[in-house]
Design a protein with these regions (language model features):
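HEAT/HEAT-like alpha-solenoid repeats
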Residues: 4-13, 41-58, 85-100, 126-141, ...
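Alpha-helical solenoid scaffolds in large eukaryotic transport, assembly, and signaling factors
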Residues: 2-4, 14-87
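A generic tandem-repeat structural signature
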Residues: 65-139, 144-149
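Eukaryotic alpha-helical solenoid repeat scaffolds
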Residues: 8, 101-103, 108-110, 142, ...
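Hydrophobic residues within the alpha-helices of tandem HEAT/HEAT-like
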Residues: 16, 30-36, 70-81, 99-100, ...
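Long, low-complexity, highly charged intrinsically disordered regions
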Residues: 2-11, 17, 25-28, 152-153, ...
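Short inter-helical turns and helix N-cap capping residues of alpha-solenoid HEAT/ARM repeat scaffolds
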Residues: 19-20, 62-63, 103-104, 144-145, ...
Length: 377
């Protein structure tokens, strides 16, 4: 096997880890030229040896300047490889990703810069590493070093551009990672996540709406964030999805209804209003699809009828009337017993309006389903 030390002149390797940036930069340019010649000659064994040397002797070095030099070198090698770079990505990208968690802020900065330069060369070919890159960027978005945050932001923009133009991106593989990250409370990470949701939703070939139940609760969670900007971004994303739901013939109302019912009793007013507004639209749009969830929906609506916020009371009353107006049949899954239990429970409510509406429901059930109700009373 070829040794990279025989391929790269000692002076280049020495300057690659020099403390002076100019020397490192010039060494990288020389390295790029050497790799370019090897690529033209088709000598991929020597190219692999060079990449291996940069990874093992530089990016894995205990010395920070060596690690920086290794990152610069890997980016330079990729630039030198140009169209041949894709076949070496399995060697090139992992050490750069590892450097994202380096204790030295400058090394993390150089890792962002290196991956940026690598991504510019290989474009869509690096999509195979997307989840790992996304995970790294997610953490770097909240980095303690402002320079690292800035570099990560530039890289993030490039990655978004590449993903939106790529036909290799797998939304199915990405969603579990997104779902896992949605519970993070850090404001920078939350902005990062909403930014990605918005960008992916704007791509015609990516069906984010189909996966909305996987991250809907996370978006609702952001509505009560202490940052006005994050609340606004989450609200904007939710508004866009609700509009898409109105225009979509097939939506999984059930899974989302479960989430909305939980959020309708949130201590945060804005979250309650948004949840009850969604429930209102779902009742209008979903109709009989929501029959199995009627009791849960009613359980969320009745307390909101007496909410201290007038906007919430208005929407809750309207939703209550919509719900009562839908034709129901126990044979189609309408659970008379569950509706009755909710209504009886709300008879003990401290709020008069809620108690009155609960009585209306019991009266309505007696008219439409007398036998079933009498068995339960």
């Amino acid at each position: 096997m070829t040794d990279g030390l025989w391929v790269i002149p000692a002076s280049v390797l020495r300057n690659l880890s020099d403390k002076l940036y100019e020397k490192r930069k010039n060494a990288a340019l020389e390295l790029e030229g050497i790799v370019k010649q090897l690529a033209v000659a088709g000598d991929h064994e020597k190219i692999s040896a060079v990449i291996n040397l940069l990874s093992s002797e530089f990016t894995a070095s205990p010395q920070a300047n060596h690690r920086k030099g290794g990152l610069i070198g890997l980016a330079a090698a990729t630039v030198g490889l140009t169209s041949e770079a894709a076949q070496h990505l399995e060697q090139i990208v992992p050490p750069v990703l590892k450097a994202f968690s380096d204790q030295d802020g400058r090394v993390r900065y150089y890792a962002c810069e290196a991956l940026y330069n690598i991504a510019k060369v290989v474009r869509g070919d690096f999509i195979i590493f997307f989840n790992k890159i996304f995970d790294a960027l997610c953490k770097l978005s909240a980095d303690s070093d402002a320079n690292v945050q800035s570099a990560a932001h530039l890289l993030d923009r490039l990655v978004k551009d590449i993903v939106t133009e790529s036909d290799q991106f797998s939304i199915e593989e990405f969603i579990p990672l997104l779902r896992e990250r949605m519970n993070v409370l850090n404001p920078y990470v939350r902005q990062f996540l909403v930014g990605w949701i918005t960008v992916l939703d704007s791509v015609p070939d990516i069906d984010m709406l189909g996966f909305l139940p996987d991250f809907l609760d996370g978006l609702f969670n952001m509505l009560s964030d202490s940052s006005h900007e994050i609340r606004q971004q989450a609200d904007s994303a939710l508004s866009e999805f609700l509009q898409e739901i109105k225009n979509s013939p097939s939506v999984d109302y059930g899974r989302m209804a479960e989430i909305l019912v939980q959020r309708a009793v949130s201590p945060d007013e804005f979250t309650r209003l948004t949840a009850i507004t969604w429930i209102n639209e779902f009742v209008k749009l979903g109709g009989d699809q929501l029959v199995p969830y009627y009791a849960d929906i009613l359980g969320a609506i009745l307390p909101c009828i007496s909410d201290k916020e007038e906007k919430i009371r208005v929407v809750a009353r309207e939703t209550n009337e919509e719900l009562r107006g839908i034709k129901t049949d126990p044979a189609e899954g309408f659970d008379v017993r569950a509706i009755l239990l909710i209504s009886k429970r709300e008879l003990s409510s401290e709020w008069e309006l809620t108690r009155i509406e609960a009585l209306h429901w019991i009266s309505s059930l007696l008219v439409k389903h007398r036998d079933e109700v009498r068995d339960q009373l």
